[in-house]
């Protein structure tokens, strides 16, 4: 064999070996390195790593952290570029002494304990809510679909309610009809994901409603696959371990009443065509219906609350499509048995919980939660709304939403479930 051929052979073999080494390295980064990070504790219970012996590990940890930080920070960079954002506020360096970079920082955020000015009674209430949630997730007596699956079993499209703020290390699972418009506004301010004439919004109430519910405004978990491919689940787990996760819930029956009022008692073209027309045909025996919601309302054609309950209980409804997010169960939106939430807020105590959460996140000096809407649906209205609903339907409806009642500590509405 001539020398040129030998040279080409060695070149091919060397290139193949190099490619193999690169593949092995990235596979290791995607597994062992990421699981090293996911083993870290939550932000509010972090303990300092020992400072002795860190010198020998610095090369390894800095390599891992550089790769992880690059992935984590690419979220914000992608959003910034897509909105033609030219400046990013500098992140202050942590003032605390010598702790591992891996332990202390995700994109430079200070993960010290969030306990400033906390109210012991409200802290106790939070602990009770979270404990109740964990206990029933582990309790075999409460059974509901999806309870026993793992986080990896959740389809990507079911993670679309988890909004991520990388600047402050926050994940919010939004539940429609539970103050989600204002919490989305808060997340926009914190993440600086939307600009107003070149500058990030500072006041949540300044953000137009049409932008708040635009899916392109928020970074959600279901978008990770397109950005990170095989690393997406690993990265989600890193953030779920490191970030503060919260959600707000509401009495399930009151939430249904609120959804009905806003989507079917007010003129809503989208919900009329997609939901009201089929309901009126199936449950109110209307065969010829106007093309627009305004014409239907003028003719006195409206979905009744009983029609809405029939729709929810009809076994054929979800054979066609999953429940709309406005009446889908919270356990299906936010996966509370797969995600260990750090804060569980309730609409019934919204003002107090919002203030406590902003202190917990250490952002209470930056913004205030917008004032709550005082004309919202009240729990005292339940008996009036369900007065004309047959008892058997009420009992079936409770079974449909029982998991939400139990997991989040809402009492069983006995007055509605018996004659």
UniProtKB/Swiss-Prot annotation:
Q: Where is the composition biased (Basic and acidic residues)?
A: 78-87
Primary localization: Golgi
Query: E.C. number, please?
Result: 2.8.2.5
InterPro entries, sorted:
Carb_sulfotrans_8-10, Sulfotransferase
* Region: Disordered, residue numbers: 78-99
GO terms for MF: chondroitin 4-sulfotransferase activity
Spans within the Cytoplasmic topological domain:
1-5
Record-annotated membrane-spanning stretches: 6-26
Q: What class of enzyme is it?
A: transferase
Give a GO cellular-component term.
Golgi membrane
Reactions catalysed according to its record? chondroitin beta-D-glucuronate + n 3'-phosphoadenylyl sulfate = chondroitin 4'-sulfate + n adenosine 3',5'-bisphosphate + n H(+)
Protein's UniProt keywords contain Membrane: yes
- Keywords associated with the record: Carbohydrate metabolism, Glycoprotein, Golgi apparatus, Membrane, Signal-anchor, Transferase, Transmembrane, Transmembrane helix
Q: Which residues lie on this side of the membrane: Lumenal?
A: 27-419
Query: What role does this protein play?
Result: Catalyzes the transfer of sulfate to position 4 of the N-acetylgalactosamine (GalNAc) residue of chondroitin and desulfated dermatan sulfate. Chondroitin sulfate constitutes the predominant proteoglycan present in cartilage and is distributed on the surfaces of many cells and extracellular matrices. Activity toward partially desulfated dermatan sulfate is however lower. Does not form 4, 6-di-O-sulfated GalNAc when chondroitin sulfate C is used as an acceptor.
Q: Which family does it belong to?
A: Belongs to the sulfotransferase 2 family.
Protein name as annotated? Carbohydrate sulfotransferase 12
What is the organism field in this record? Mus musculus
Lineage here is: Eukaryota, Metazoa, Chordata, Craniata, Vertebrata
Q: Which gene encodes it?
A: Chst12
């Amino acid at each position: 064999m001539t020398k040129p051929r030998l040279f080409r052979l060695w070149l091919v073999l060397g290139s193949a070996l190099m490619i193999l080494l690169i593949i092995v390295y990235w596979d290791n980064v995607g597994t062992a390195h990421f699981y090293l990070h996911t083993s870290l504790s939550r932000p509010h219970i972090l303990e300092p790593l020992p400072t002795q012996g860190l010198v020998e590990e610095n090369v390894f940890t800095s390599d891992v952290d550089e790769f992880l930080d690059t992935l984590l920070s690419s979220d914000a960079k992608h959003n910034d570029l897509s909105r033609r954002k030219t400046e990013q506020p500098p992140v202050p360096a942590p003032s605390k002494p010598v702790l591992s970079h891996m332990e202390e920082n995700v994109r430079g955020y200070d993960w010290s304990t969030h306990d400033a000015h906390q109210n012991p009674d409200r802290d106790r209430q939070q602990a009770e809510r979270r404990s109740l949630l964990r206990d029933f997730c582990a309790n075999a007596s409460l059974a509901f679909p999806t309870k026993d699956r793992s986080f990896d079993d959740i389809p990507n499209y079911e993670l679309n309610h988890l909004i991520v703020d990388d600047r402050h290390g926050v994940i919010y699972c939004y539940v429609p009809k539970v103050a989600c418009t204002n919490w989305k506004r808060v997340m926009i301010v914190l993440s600086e994901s939307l600009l107003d004439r070149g500058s990030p919004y500072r006041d949540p109430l300044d953000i137009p409603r049409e932008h708040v519910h635009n899916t392109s405004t928020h970074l959600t978990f279901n978008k990770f696959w397109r950005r990170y491919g095989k690393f997406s689940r690993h990265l989600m787990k890193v953030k779920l371990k490191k970030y503060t996760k919260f959600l707000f819930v509401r009495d399930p029956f009151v939430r249904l009443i609120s959804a009905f009022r806003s989507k079917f008692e007010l003129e809503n073209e989208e919900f009329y065509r997609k939901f009201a027309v089929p309901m009126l045909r199936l449950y109110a025996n209307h065969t010829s219906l106007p093309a627009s919601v305004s014409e239907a309302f003028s003719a006195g054609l409206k979905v009744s609350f009983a029609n809405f309950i029939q729709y929810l209980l009809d076994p054929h409804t979800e054979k066609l499509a999953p429940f709309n997010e406005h009446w889908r169960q919270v356990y299906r939106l936010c996966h509370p048995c797969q995600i260990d939430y750090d804060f569980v807020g309730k609409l019934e105590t919204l003002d107090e919980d919002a203030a406590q959460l902003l202190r917990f996140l250490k952002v209470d000096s930056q913004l205030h939660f917008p004032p709550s809407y005082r004309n919202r649906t009240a729990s005292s209205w339940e008996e009036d709304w369900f007065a004309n609903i047959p008892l058997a339907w009420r009992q079936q409806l409770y079974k449909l939403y029982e998991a939400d009642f139990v997991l989040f500590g809402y009492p069983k509405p006995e007055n509605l479930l018996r004659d």
